[in-house]
């Protein structure tokens, strides 16, 4: 059974995550004090029910040792996993401005900006221990819920989920990536006026890239590298592997190569998925 501990900065999406986990059959508890985690797990152990518990800055223990002790006292039937949600400072400020809600640390007479910074410092012990950190800055509510469904179904089936994610460097590197590959040196379809409005999902762009030996070599060497270490990653008690592929705009080269890698590993029987950050962002 899984005990999913959901934490993160206020405004990053903990409530959304908890609702998504509840939809997946988890028994969910919001804002449970850390010291009560062993009691909750013991009560649920006989029912064979996976649980999800959210922890925010208000019920953090006074020291990291108390959290570690609570983890050590969990029943052996449970496999604890720590999910930490985060977002950049400006996004959190905007979300609070939109909802007009008070920050949990506002009772300390701190400004919103100071409360966000103080919370970041207080939650660092949990962030550093997290099994998965998700940056929700560019995510909608639905995208976050879908990502959790993808990741958790892989976890509950005890199968490594490989996520090949394209992105544009001008939009920033995904912080949830385990590996980042830069393909900005490869031939760029952007400079062909006919291909510029298309994406790496379109056949003419794929045909353009497929004509170049260096593109084939890059795909071959990248998949060979991943295949070399995949057996160790699969036995390392992890549920997902995120491989980010970046080009300048995240529209052509990175999309094509992410799709090629995902197709290759799917053909080898792996649970491989593709995600295109720039293309998804342009649709929203």
Swiss-Prot record:
Known role: Modulates the synthesis of GlmS, by affecting the processing and stability of the regulatory small RNA GlmZ. When glucosamine-6-phosphate (GlcN6P) concentrations are high in the cell, RapZ binds GlmZ and targets it to cleavage by RNase E. Consequently, GlmZ is inactivated and unable to activate GlmS synthesis. Under low GlcN6P concentrations, RapZ is sequestered and inactivated by an other regulatory small RNA, GlmY, preventing GlmZ degradation and leading to synthesis of GlmS.
Pfam families xref list: PapZ_C, RapZ-like_N
Residues annotated to bind ATP: 8-15
This protein's encoding gene: rapZ
Keyword RNA-binding: yes
Family in the record: Belongs to the RapZ-like family. RapZ subfamily.
Annotated region described as RNA-binding, given as residue ranges: 266-284
Annotated keywords: ATP-binding, GTP-binding, Nucleotide-binding, RNA-binding
Entry annotated with the keyword Iron-sulfur: no
Range of residues in the leader sequence: none
InterPro entries in alphabetical order: P-loop_NTPase (IPR027417), RapZ-like (IPR005337), RapZ-like_N (IPR053930), RapZ_C (IPR053931)
Protein name as annotated: RNase adapter protein RapZ
Family matches, as NCBIfam families: PRK05416.1
Residues binding GTP, per UniProt: 56-59
Assembly mode: Homotrimer.
Domain of life of the organism encoding this protein: Bacteria
MF annotations from Gene Ontology: ATP binding; GTP binding; RNA binding
């Amino acid at each position: 059974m899984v005990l999913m501990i959901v934490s993160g900065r206020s405004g990053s999406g903990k409530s959304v995550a908890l609702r998504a986990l509840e939809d997946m059959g988890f028994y969910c508890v919001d804002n449970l004090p850390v010291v009560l985690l062993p009691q909750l797990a013991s009560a649920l152990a006989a029912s064979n029910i996976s649980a999800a518990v959210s922890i925010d800055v208000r019920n953090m223990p006074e020291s990291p040792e108390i959290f570690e002790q609570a983890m050590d006292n969990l029943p052996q039937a449970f496999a604890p996993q720590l999910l930490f949600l985060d977002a950049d400072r400006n996004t959190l400020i905007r979300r609070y401005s939109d909802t007009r809600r008070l920050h949990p640390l506002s009772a300390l007479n701190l400004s919103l900006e100071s409360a966000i910074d103080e919370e970041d410092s207080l939650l660092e012990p949990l962030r550093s221990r997290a099994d998965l950190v998700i940056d929700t800055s560019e995510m909608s509510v639905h995208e976050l819920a879908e990502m959790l469904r993808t990741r958790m179904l892989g976890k509950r089936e005890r199968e490594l989920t490989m996520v090949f994610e394209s992105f544009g460097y001008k939009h920033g590197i995904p912080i949830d990536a385990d590996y980042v590959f830069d393909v900005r040196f490869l031939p760029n379809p952007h400079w062909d006026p006919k291909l510029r409005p298309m994406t790496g999902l379109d056949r003419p762009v794929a045909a353009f890239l497929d004509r170049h030996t260096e593109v084939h070599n890059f795909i071959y060497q990248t998949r060979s590298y991943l295949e070399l270490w995949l057996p160790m990653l699969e036995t390392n008690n992890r549920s997902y592997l995120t491989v980010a592929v970046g080009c300048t705009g995240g529209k052509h080269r990175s999309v094509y190569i992410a799709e090629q890698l995902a197709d290759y590993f799917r053909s080898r029987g792996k649970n491989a998925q593709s995600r295109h950050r720039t293309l998804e962002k342009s649709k929203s």
